[in-house]
Amino acid sequence: MIVSTKGRYALRVMVHFAQRGGEEYIPLKEIAEAEGISQKYLESIMSTLSKAGFVDAVHGKGGGYRLNRKAEEYTVGSILKLTEGSLSAVSCTTQGASACSRSECCNALPMWTRLDKMIDEFFEGITIADLIQESNTL
């Protein structure tokens, strides 16, 4: 599993909001400049986060984006699943994927399934608040 740029940037943006307190609307341009992300690419990420209900969006003068929950309520897993679609290490264990012709005799399938569970539990066990707290101790 390789986390895409979209997933990494989405995490950075969510941390950015949380560090700012999450209350005020932050203009897209300001977020892009602060995080070193192209405004065009960030629009796509923010659209994804907004449509999924992770952030609130207000358009026009004085508008921008903000968190609509506490940082403790956003897991890294939920953000990455939204942006990546799947956190599966191999395609045959991806939810909704067509069954592999060898799935019934694949000796490695149980291992891949356990790995997927470990990855899911790991990322679901980390919140945006945890990321901020850990970075403050470095």
Predicted features by range, described:
Residues 26-36:
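A short alpha-helical element within helix-turn-helix/winged-helix DNA-binding domains
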Residues 68-138:
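Non-DNA-binding regulatory cores of transcription-related proteins
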Residues 33, 50-51:
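Alpha-helical residues within the helix-turn-helix
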Residues 46-47:
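Short, hydrophobic-biased segments on the C-terminal half of alpha helices
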Residues 54-62, 66-67:
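Beta-hairpin "wing" of winged helix-turn-helix
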Residues 8-22:
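Short amphipathic alpha-helical interface segments
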